[in-house]
Amino acid sequence: MDKVPFTFSGLGKIKLELDNLKKFERPQVIQAISVAREHGDLKENAEYHAAKEKQAFIEGHITELEDVTSRAEVIDLTRLSGKTVTFGTKVNIVDEESDQETNYQIVGPYEANLKEGLISVASPIARALIGKEVGMSVAVTTPGGTKNYEILTIEVPKS
């Protein structure tokens, strides 16, 4: 079984999500199934089928998150030097063509959230940045073509 890298806060969020699914989402969908059953014929009961579909999704998600948390490896960010881009570091880069600056933190695949500036260690841009230092340029191949970025800063987050 492969370990799944997490920041401390990222694993906490996943555990909260799992707890919410087990304590709130699961009981709600079980109740919805029970109510829908009372409406009679299950063959043509759209409410029942929708609730069963939601239950399958929730149970699948619970199984996935239980597996992921059992294989979680929290990376101690206090041990990072900040000299190179690594898992957990925050990096400020600039698009060499448009001069647009972007901030990212390199995190595990289950905590990635582009809106929050959290990118997966497995993403093309993170793979290009890993191991690089401030001032270095990287080329990132995307479906839209190759983009060139310069690393402006590397920071080790407080936690």
Region roles according to the model:
Residues 1, 152-159:
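Short, charged, intrinsically disordered terminal tails
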Residues 75-155:
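Non-DNA-binding regulatory cores of transcription-related proteins
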Residues 2, 38, 70-71, 81, ...:
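Glycine-rich, flexible loop/turn motifs
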Residues 21-24, 32, 36, 65-72, ...:
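Conserved, well-folded catalytic cores of nucleic-acid-processing
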Residues 46-79, 83:
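Internal alpha/beta loop-helix hairpins
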Residues 1-19, 23-60:
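N-terminal cationic and glycine-rich segments that engage phosphates or anionic surfaces
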